[in-house]
A protein has these predicted regions:
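Non-heme di-metal
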Residues: 2-347
């Protein structure tokens, strides 16, 4: 397999013709020209991501400080383990995205990857703010490192981490494609049992500030999911030779593995011990998401019978909406948080 070449940073011989631009294997000048983009969707993505700017510390966690010691034992354990999982995922994303960007030869897509990397930093900041606010430094450090001291967490992280490390050792297009699929799975599957747990706490009148932090993170992750879906679908058009029957089957198994791991994680960390959630709800919802992510790439559903959002989980979409206007005495600002409104004109 031919090794991918890392793009040069200074390239006077790069081709400025947007018609010849490619996602990988192109000859880029690295010039950020907002008026000449090959991929029209980048303009909308960029604007949406920039409009999503938020600051974790502007969300009031005073009620969470009171709620955290009163959580049921199962709720508190789940809160700690899920936070440990999420902070590790966003940390490894921050470290890995530049590795992908080094081989992306569409400069407008690299702009998107740079914004994503910044947002992953904000997410890590958010988790740190949550932990610093609600627990002691000793408890904080214990929670942070459960990602490697808890065998279930370590097993989960190994699946994605090994895939990322593989590209460190083997720089070819099929391996890069697998890394992109791993990103897609992480952004579109791996977070969702955890997100659902926080929304369920809020639904039960607990940890509302934490849930609001997660809403903004969830909103960002939706744009990251959109980004990697589009990168993969552009590669399907530009380099169909990467998507052989064997390759697609391998990607399919990656998606299925991601779904099954997320279900197993939900069983372990949530199970039937959290009021408002149970194993059946988790498994139905994650299989539905697996179908949604896989069919969005143009392939048949993985799990027949799970093509529609489960009725038992329809509330998740409402609680995940960061733009719902809801204010109360304890909140510093409306949850319809936006630094700017979307502009009508294009970039």
């Amino acid at each position: 397999m031919t090794e991918l070449k890392k793009k040069p940073l200074f390239n006077p011989e790069g081709d400025p013709d947007v018609r010849l631009r490619r996602m990988i294997g192109g000859n880029t000048t690295n010039l950020n020209d907002f008026n000449n983009m090959k991929y029209a969707w980048v303009s909308d993505w960029y604007r949406q991501a920039m409009n999503n700017f938020w600051i974790p510390e502007e969300i009031n966690l005073s009620q969470d400080v009171k709620d955290y010691p009163r959580l049921l034992s199962a709720e508190r354990s789940a809160y700690d383990k899920i936070l440990s999982f999420l902070v590790f995922l966003d940390s490894i994303q921050t470290a890995n995205l530049p590795n992908i960007g080094a081989y992306i030869t569409a400069n407008e897509v690299n702009l998107c990857l740079s914004i994503q990397a910044f947002q992953e930093c904000v997410h890590s900041q958010s988790y740190s703010y949550m932990l610093d606010t609600i627990c002691s430094p000793v408890e904080r450090n214990d929670i942070l490192y459960q990602w490697k001291t808890d065998e279930h967490l370590l097993r989960r992280n190994t699946f994605i981490g090994d895939c990322y490390n593989e590209f460190q050792e083997r720089k070819d297009a099929p391996t890069l494609l697998r890394v992109m699929m791993a990103n897609y799975i992480l952004e579109g599957i791996y977070f969702y049992s955890g997100f659902t747990f926080f929304y369920n706490l809020s639904r039960n009148g607990k940890m509302s500030g934490s849930a609001q932090e997660i809403r903004y993170i969830n909103r960002d992750e939706n744009t990251h999911l959109w980004l990697f879906r589009n990168i993969i679908t552009e590669l399907q058009k530009e380099q169909p030779e990467l998507f052989t029957a064997e390759s697609v089957q391998a990607l399919r198994e990656m998606m299925r593995e991601g779904v099954e791991q997320e279900i197993a994680w939900g069983y372990y960390v949530i199970g039937d011990d959290i009021p408002g959630l149970n194993r059946q709800m988790i498994s139905d919802y994650i299989r539905y998401l697996g179908n949604l992510r896989w069919t969005s790439l143009g392939y048949p559903a993985l799990y027949p019978g799970f093509e529609s959002e489960p009725e038992s989980m329809e509330w998740v979409s409402q609680y995940a909406d960061a733009n719902m206007v809801k204010t109360d005495f304890f909140e510093a600002r409306s949850t319809a948080y936006a630094k700017s409104t979307a502009l009508i004109d294009d970039l």
